[in-house]
């Protein structure tokens, strides 16, 4: 398993793995990378290098999931990335799939029960996914951020308490 590191040119990685383009877009990185390294691009976009590399390497390597490292990242970093991922699927991918599927179904012979079933399955899946995304945005993400803030407050109180001992 070959991992991306800070000294590699990001354009080389994208050339080999074009499916990475939507992932780097979520970090505000657009094509036209030139010969800049991952480190250069992270500095330019004010990105946490470790978080960026962890996301990229997790995406590219099925067996790579650094659970301990993920636990070290600030909750807001993770929530921001997941929010952008949700937006990508709800605003781009789902409408694109729906448009192509609808076109395919409308161009096919009438009374095809298999296509009708596929259409129903997709609509059901889309509704479930959009509902999950809505729950993330309204409940789960705010809860995670609030919990993180409370933990931070507790840690600050512990520090204050130690200072007075």
Q: What residues fall within each predicted segment?
A:
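Small-residue-biased structural context
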Residues: 1-164
């Amino acid at each position: 398993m070959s991992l991306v590191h800070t000294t590699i040119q990001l354009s080389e990685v994208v050339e080999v793995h074009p499916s990475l383009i939507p992932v780097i877009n979520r970090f505000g990185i657009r094509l036209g990378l030139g010969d800049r390294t991952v480190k250069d691009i992270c500095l330019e976009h004010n990105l946490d290098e470790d978080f960026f590399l962890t996301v990229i390497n997790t995406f590219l390597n099925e067996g790579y999931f650094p659970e301990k490292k993920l636990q070290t990242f600030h909750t807001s970093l993770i929530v921001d990335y997941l929010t952008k991922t949700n937006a990508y699927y709800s605003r781009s991918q789902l409408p694109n799939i729906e448009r192509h599927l609808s076109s395919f179904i409308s161009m096919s012979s009438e009374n095809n029960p298999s296509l009708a079933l596929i259409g129903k399955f997709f609509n059901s899946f889309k509704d479930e996914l959009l509902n999950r995304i809505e729950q993330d945005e309204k409940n789960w993400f705010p809860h995670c951020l609030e919990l993180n803030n409370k933990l931070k407050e507790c840690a600050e109180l512990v520090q204050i308490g130690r200072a007075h001992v």
